[in-house]
Design a protein with these regions (language model features):
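Short Cys/His-rich "knuckle" micro-motifs
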Residues: 74, 305-310
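Short cysteine-rich clusters marking metal-coordination/redox-active sites
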Residues: 296-299, 311-314
Length: 319
């Protein structure tokens, strides 16, 4: 008889954007996109969902470790190029992407075993969601943390806005999210954002030692302790995550994400002055070319943005 909950070997899974291994009661999920600083695409999320579900159901797994490939980045958040190519054009796809992201985060947080974030490089933007979602975190001493959302037209509302104040305090959370300045691994340690900082060459040894200690917990007691410890995170998450998903979807068609993401891709500063100047002058700063209120008297086309001087349908100069 087929046993639906039987243990599956890690080699059974054919992942492309993550590495998945199970060894000595520890399951390790590695974001394997170092060429884009381990940014997370929709494909990455699908694979993470499958890996976390397997780790949750595998009774031989006692600890789950999440890390990134290489030594440059743990995770840089969502894939900016995918955002520009997919979500700016079709916001409904961003809603779908966020659904995958929320599912993956939920599975990781409720995997039923202690979780460890092995921070091997920069933790940027929504990458900090995954650090905050883990029970414990060990960082290499070269790691830097930075929240860039408000400068690239996004809000990191998939965990960071909800959980960062609970972990480091409200003032420090506001400092990270609104100032957008880097903080070092040592500063993160002093703030309680990580549990330990070690030289990069000692990172695996430290993570393995922590995992060996966590294995000694009785599994049901550890699972329920995690459930109780997650109360405030669960409460904040339940009250805001769905709202954030919808608002970020609607906002993805606005000028701010267009300018912010494009500036990030072009590796240039965000032109926040133009957005502020148009608003100060009484124009629409929410839309790239202004509100779609103009009409062409020549062909009758409607819904033309205020910033257009010519009709996009017939080419006539607008009155």
């Amino acid at each position: 008889m087929n046993e639906p909950y039987a243990r599956q070997p890690a080699s059974r899974f054919r992942f492309e954007e993550i590495l998945y291994e199970k060894k000595d009661v520890v399951a390790r999920v590695t974001l394997n996109r170092p060429e884009v600083y381990n940014a997370i695409s929709a494909q990455t999320l699908r694979e993470m969902v499958e890996a976390f579900r397997d780790a949750s159901w595998d009774d031989s797994v006692a600890v789950v470790v999440l890390t990134g490939a290489g030594d440059k980045a743990f995770c840089s958040g969502s894939d900016a190029k995918e955002f520009a190519q997919q979500f700016l054009r079709r916001p409904r796809n961003f809603w779908k992407y966020q659904g995958l992201l929320l599912e993956a985060l939920e599975l990781f947080r409720h995997v039923g075993k202690p979780t460890v974030a092995r921070l091997n490089g920069v933790v940027a933007g929504a990458g900090n969601d995954w650090n905050l979602a883990a029970d414990l975190a060990i960082a290499a001493d070269h790691v830097r943390f930075i929240q860039v959302g408000t400068r690239v037209g996004l809000v990191e509302a998939w965990g960071t806005t909800q959980w960062l104040p609970l972990v480091v305090g409200e003032r420090r959370a506001r400092e990270m999210l609104l100032k957008g300045e880097e903080i070092t691994a040592e500063q993160a340690l002093s703030w309680g954002l990580v549990n330990e900082v070690v030289p990069y060459k000692q990172l695996d040894r430290a993570v393995n030692a922590l995992a060996a200690r966590l294995v000694q917990n009785l599994p049901e007691c550890a699972r329920y302790a995690r459930q109780q410890l997650g109360f405030w995170k669960d409460l904040a998450w339940a009250m805001t995550a769905g709202h954030a998903r919808d608002w970020l979807t609607v906002h993805s068609t606005a000028w701010e994400p267009y300018e912010g993401v494009q500036a990030f891709i072009d590796k240039r500063p965000t032109d926040y002055k133009s957005i502020r100047s148009r608003a100060a002058a009484g124009g629409s700063s929410e839309s790239l070319w202004g509100a779609p209120t103009r009409k062409c008297e020549n062909c009758g086309a409607k819904g033309i943005p205020e910033g257009f001087d010519y009709c996009g349908k017939c080419g006539s100069k607008l009155q």
